[in-house]
Amino acid sequence: MGRNIQGPSMIRVPDWVENPLGDYYLYFADHRGEYIRMAYADEVTGPWTVYSPGTLKLEDSFFPTSCPPCSLAPGRTAALYAHIASPDVHVREDLGQIVMYVHGRDVGQQFTRLAISTDGINFEGR
């Protein structure tokens, strides 16, 4: 699952989601992760079940999947790595969407990208 888990973001699953896995979805990631993880529960206090195989994958996020190109930072000496992490998830009731902001590396810098879902599991990177 990873050694550097961070960036948890929890939502109450909207009523318009068909066949939800639970009443709450908790999104998180390993900072060197290749996908955003998700756990679900019917109560905020759990028990939580980790959804496998995860939700948004690095290759679907529009971030590079290998370095370079993400290691092109001028003067950079530390190793860089392709990743997707730090999900920040919001329910857009007005649009019937679940919106996820994530960060990753591209051309040597950290960037934030957006992904959209109607079910909280299958996200489309933008």
Language-model segments: residues:
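Beta-rich carbohydrate-recognition and catalytic domains
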Residues: M1-A85, H90-R126
